Structures are given as C-alpha cells and as structure tokens.
C-alpha cells in the first residue's frame, strides 16, 4: 500500500492509475478524486533530459578535441591517447613554438609553395622525389646522429620543444615535458644558475658558496632551496643577438641507479650547450649526458687515461700508460696538483669545472693544455666524477678520465721552470751543501733581511736579479751575492719564474729556485702568467711569492671552492702586479 498523502489528513491513499504504461498519481479524498502535485517521476525526467544534453555536449567537445589532436605533429598512436588537458597544453606550446621559430636566423616555417600546379607526383623527376623524402626525414636523422637530446625554452623557462630522444637518456616522456616548466625537472640547487643562463636574473656578485660533500644523497638534495621565480622577471638587456651558453645542470632521470651519484639521487648531470637568442628571449640547446661513474661500465680506449684525484685535484694515482701519451711518468705526477700542469690560459676554465664538480658531482671539462716535461703541451678533455670509497663510505675521491686529443705541441717552448733544460739544473749543483744560509744583514743598496716572524728561506741559491733597461743606472751601486756561497740541491721542478725586470725592484724577498720537499699549496707556476710575461722566462730569473703576483689559489686546496682574493687581485688580463708601480700588497710573513 502506498504512503498516505501528507495533506490528506492521513486517511487517504495515493494510487497511480492510467493506461498504456503511464503512471499518474491520484489522491482519493472522501468524495473527491484530485490529481496529486508533481512528484519524483517528473524530476527524474528532467534529470534524464539534462544528462542527455550534457552527454551530447561532451560528445561534441570530444570530437573537437580529437580533431585538434590529429593536427598536432605527433604520431596517431600517441595523439589518440591524450587527455583534454594535454591536448590544450601541446596545442598552445606548438603555437608558441611556431612564433618562436619564425624569429630564427634563418626563420623556420612550413613550405609556402609546393610543387608547380598541375604537376602530379608521378610526373616529377626522381631527383625531386628523393629530395622531398630526404627533407621530410632530415630532422629524424639529425636527432639519431646526436649524442643527446635537443630542446628549446621560451622566456618563462617552459619547454617549447624537446626531442623524443630524451627518453633514451633520461627515461622521461616527450609529451609530458613539452609545455612544462624546466624547473620541474632540474635540481633545486640549479634553479638560480638556469635563471642566470636564460638571462632572467642578473648574476649575484660575490664568491660562490663552497658546497659540502655529503655521503647521503637525500640530504644533499635538500641543501639548496627552490628559488622563487618572480612574476615580473627582470630581463638583462641583450648585448648581442646570439649568446653562446655552456653549463651543467642536474635533471631528473628514471635511469639512474641507486647510490650511484653521491650528490643527488635520481638526477643526472647534463651538459647543456646552445645559443640564447636575446631578441626572441629563448634558448635552443643540446643536452649531453655524461658517461657513467663506474669504470666497469665505461669503455676505455687507447687514447684515454684514468686518474684518481683528491677533491682538491691532487693526483693520487694514475695509469702506467700515461707515458705512452706524455713524457711524464706516474712517479712524476703522483702527489702533484693538476693545476701545476694546466696551461695558464686554461686555468680559469679548469677552476670553473672544479667548482661545478664539487657542486654537482660530475662535470666535463673543455679543451685544455697539459704541460710536458721537455716543453710544450698536449691537448686534453676530461670527464670528472666524485665517487665514494668502498672501504670508507664517508671518503670521496675524483675519477678523472682524460681523452688525449693531440700529440705534443710546442716542444721547444718552456712554459714552466720544470721544463727548462738540464744544463740550468746542473749549474745549480755546484755545491752539495743542503743547509740553507741566512741572508746578509741589511745594508745600503741591498735587500732587507727578513723579519723574525717571516717564513724561513727556502732551500736553494739566490738568483741574480736582472735589472730592467730603465733601471740599470739605479742598480749599479747594489751588490750581488756570490752564488757559490749558497749551495743547494738542484730540484727546479714545478716552480714559477718571471724576469725580474718585468716587476719594479722593491724590497721584496725572493724565493729560492728549489722548493722544499713537498711544494707548498700556494706556489704559482708560470702557466698562470700571460703569454707576454711567460715568454720572458729564462734561466737568469727570479721567483716571487704568490702574493707579490696577486694570483693565489688556496681555495683549490680545500674541499669546496672559494675566492682567495677579490676579483681585483685576479685580473682577467693576467697582469702580474695588480698594485701601483713600485708598491706591493702586504703579505703575512713579509
């Protein structure tokens, strides 16, 4: 029995009568038969009608989205599986890419004019057909030949395009990355660097903060906070239409092994090289993945040499076949710093690679010159990786894999004191006495004696100071010490020499030519001098301490990078004396 109608006083019944399958509610009151008001049946009809309208609208939208997806430059198997949000994102990105590419040099665009009208494909020559097919597949062939993936970023740091080869090197999807922000895929500690490389943020002045090497990959990834990307990014005024870019970033990867990288787990170090087009405010670059860290997975060829270095780039061990490519043996390399063999013009780039190595855990250096013992140099390129020790998890070292790119060049050009002929060293061995002698008391016309708190005189003889052409008159009254009175054991290895006439003769205490048993970390070799000054290096020279030259690098002996002196004391032109003529900066021990 049906429930009583609420307004019937509880004594009536509600029945549904009608024919032909229709159900009409009626209210039987005493002596009356009244039609009941609209009930659940009419509401159900309205809901059904609304659902049908929404279903029809969604069907039309899906049809339009399907047609839009077919216009995307993607394979049909991929475009048919996209959702609506992905279709809209890829469509907007493609339109932005077309606008970005139209500003290229030369501008890129679809072929406006096809074959001549009325000329059927069958009537075209074989050469025209081959050329057309080649142009259609040219992009794919180029991507397959590149050892990396290509991508383009707009002014906001979003991927306008990224090649499908990114799945080979990072294991990520091209469809998911296109239109997304690059900051969603790079390490939080590299956000500031990417902003600077894109020209969206002015590089902050001051020295870089020395990173700390942590054995825990999870804790190291949380050291750097994600920088805020302001809505109104300050764009640097373009100094040129095209600017070259080369930097290293850590990008997410699903192909990295657990515990492989000590700096960040789940990230790969990518070497990004490309061009920043300032007028279009975008970056077109190529990303290279660096070789794996384990030597078991690294194919070693005949032109490759493996070094094991400390975090300060001191050589701990090297392969014996290093003598096949250089005139230096393992005994002459072990215990020395790599900076003692690097050409002076390449020292700045090696230092930057050193900073990136300590910060990101892996780096590839540019082309640099490695000094030889007999003079000259060889060209090298190295891939360095911070690896942990199997015995001591907290200890780390550097695997330095160098590719020998050339034979020895400039064999008759000495660039450092250890490259000088052996006759100079024999001249130093006139007396076998190993004990150093104290200099004479200060007299008029001679150099002053060192103070009590000054560093002790190094073992070796005093080299005669060659006065400059304009100072011959003033130096006539000054006497020179007898070389035989200061005997020393000859060891002119890894010392820095410059002609004394280049610098003004002020009371500066010269260092001995022969260094102590272990060279101090602040020694400066002649490779750091500019070619003009380095070309003046001859046997009759004098060597000064690094503070007199204004070029020191004690930060290279620490675990992390850091400036030793302000930028004014590291002049880009390689000037050996930063202060005014006739003056020098005070140094501890003088």
Curated annotation (Swiss-Prot):
Q: Where is the PAS domain?
A: 135-207, 293-359
The record's PROSITE patterns line, in alphabetical order, gives: BHLH (PS50888), PAS (PS50112)
**Which Gene Ontology BP terms does the record give?**
central nervous system development; maternal behavior; negative regulation of DNA-templated transcription; negative regulation of transcription by RNA polymerase II; regulation of transcription by RNA polymerase II; startle response
Q: Which residues form the signal peptide?
A: none
> Which Pfam families does this chain map to?
bHLH_HIF1A (PF23171), PAS (PF00989), PAS_3 (PF08447)
Q: Does the keyword tRNA processing apply?
A: no
Q: Where is the PAC domain?
A: 365-408
Describe its function: May control regulatory pathways relevant to schizophrenia and to psychotic illness. May play a role in late central nervous system development by modulating EPO expression in response to cellular oxygen level. Forms a heterodimer that binds core DNA sequence 5'-TACGTG-3' within the hypoxia response element (HRE) leading to transcriptional repression on its target gene TH.
Please describe the quaternary structure of this protein. Efficient DNA binding requires dimerization with another bHLH protein. Interacts with ARNT; forms a heterodimer that binds core DNA sequence 5'-[AG]CGTG-3' within the hypoxia response element (HRE) leading to a transcriptional repressor on its target gene TH.
- The protein, known as: Neuronal PAS domain-containing protein 1
State the organism of origin: Homo sapiens
